[in-house]
Amino acid sequence: MFKVNEYFEGKVKSLAFKDGNCDATIGVMAKGEYEFGTSTKEVMIVISGKLLIKFPNCDNWHEYSKYDCFTIEANKKFQVKTPGDSAYICRYYNDAQGCNCNCNC
């Protein structure tokens, strides 16, 4: 069954599911700024809207639009800004799993 996640007073919501051999979420973010932490390697694909990402140990913001993807390593914090409602898919990988998505991450 699906697990519903809600963060930042309901401004970020996701549904957790199994995507092949890995855990995944499909989610939405309302306009705003957020900070997330990872416990496993995460590959995020933007499916609607735009996300601006500030990676760990980086001073610059990187812009990602529809169908763009990016990777965040395990045990890191990263910042997200979205200028409007956005949607994403996030896949979670442990050390034994490789990224098998087709997004050139």
PLM feature spans:
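Short, conserved beta-strand element in jelly-roll/cupin
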Residues: 38-53
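A generic structural motif
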Residues: 18, 54-56, 81, 93
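Conserved short histidine dyad/triad with adjacent acidic residue
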Residues: 10-11, 19-39, 66-74
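Ligand-binding loop in jelly-roll beta-barrel domains
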Residues: 73-100
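Transition segment at domain starts
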Residues: 1-19
